[in-house]
């Protein structure tokens, strides 16, 4: 074959291969995560005494429970006067790129500190978390360093933060024990602001945004606090509640869905508030069992009773008929 024919042929083969490669569907890389470990912890909200613990020192991914630390730093800035509720936070283009859950902020607009706190605690808005971080520290990365430093100051030895929202990062982790320390600290250090966690909705741009924290919204005596979820973390929840003068801080993490998570939380709270468990009461009540002979005897008695009733009805009808015939005559 001559060189003149060979060169175009090679070009055609290469070009055809390139077209096939581009046309072939690209396989999406499926990331598989290990099933999260379920952890739980209940402590006395006044003394810090541990009332229940299960895998509480196991390192976990906090997901949006991260935002409790973000809010802690906001409360601290409010207390020192660095921020005020009316202070306006600038929204950057970078902040608007945050993935849901979000408030769908627009680049260049501003949002107040108070609305930001509500958006974090009620909506769990990631774009707001980035906005807060950038306004308070210049960047989310710098803000995350401040979060980790504060964690150490609060005695959270097994916690590390890399972002303000809780978006998954393998290097962002904590434990139920550390989350309890953070919750106790935010109650203790900012009693004047802590009550904001009890809000179940807020209005932003004329739209009412409701909480999806069902336990906080419906459990008797619940005060707050925060939900969290992404696939590697599972469904997480921190709840604070007070009943009959007794205060509890409870953490539940790693559940497959919000229903099992909430059920677990309610059971823990009920148990340590001393609320009688209906299922336990039913289980403890002795259920009478019938032997076969007893069942036969009961069935026989029922049959006799029915037969007697039918017989009585016939007699009454017969008596009425006779009486009717006599009166006509």
Where are the regions a protein language model picked out?
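Domain-terminus/edge residues, biased toward the C-terminal soluble/receptor-binding domains
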Residues: 156-160, 168-329
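Bacterial N-terminal signal peptides that target proteins for export
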Residues: 1-8
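Bacterial N-terminal signal peptides
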Residues: 8-17
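Active-site-adjacent loops and short helices of periplasmic peptidoglycan-processing enzymes
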Residues: 21-177, 184-187
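Short alpha-helical segments used as structural interaction elements across diverse proteins
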Residues: 1, 64, 258-261
């Amino acid at each position: 074959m001559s060189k003149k024919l060979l060169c175009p042929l090679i070009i055609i083969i290469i070009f055809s291969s390139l077209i096939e490669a581009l046309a072939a569907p690209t396989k999406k890389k499926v990331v598989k995560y290990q099933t999260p470990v379920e952890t739980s912890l209940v402590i006395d909200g006044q003394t810090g005494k541990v009332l229940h613990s299960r895998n509480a020192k196991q390192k976990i991914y906090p997901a949006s429970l991260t935002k409790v630390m973000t809010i802690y730093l906001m409360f601290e800035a409010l207390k020192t006067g660095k921020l005020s509720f009316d202070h306006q936070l600038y929204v950057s283009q970078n902040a608007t790129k945050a993935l849901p859950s979000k408030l769908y902020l627009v680049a260049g607009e501003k949002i107040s500190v108070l609305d930001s706190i509500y958006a974090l605690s009620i909506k769990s808005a990631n774009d707001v978390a980035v906005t807060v971080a950038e306004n308070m520290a210049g960047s989310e990365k710098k803000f995350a360093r401040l979060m980790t430093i504060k964690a150490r100051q609060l005695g959270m030895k097994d916690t590390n933060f890399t972002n303000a929202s809780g978006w998954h990062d393998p290097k962002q982790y904590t434990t139920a024990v550390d989350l309890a320390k953070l919750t106790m600290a935010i109650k203790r250090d900012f009693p004047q602001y802590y009550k904001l966690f009890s809000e179940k909705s807020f209005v932003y741009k004329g739209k009412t945004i409701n909480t999806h924290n069902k336990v906080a919204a419906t459990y008797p005596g619940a005060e707050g606090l925060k939900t969290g979820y992404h696939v590697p973390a599972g469904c997480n929840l921190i709840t604070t509640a007070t009943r009959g003068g007794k205060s509890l801080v409870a953490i539940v993490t790693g559940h497959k869905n919000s229903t099992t998570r909430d059920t677990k939380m309610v059971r823990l709270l009920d148990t340590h508030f001393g609320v009688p468990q209906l299922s336990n009461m039913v289980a403890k009540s002795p259920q009478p069992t019938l032997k076969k002979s007893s069942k036969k005897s009961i069935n026989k008695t029922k049959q006799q009773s029915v037969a007697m009733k039918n017989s009585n009805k016939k007699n009454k009808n017969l008596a009425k008929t006779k009486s009717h015939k006599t009166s006509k005559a």
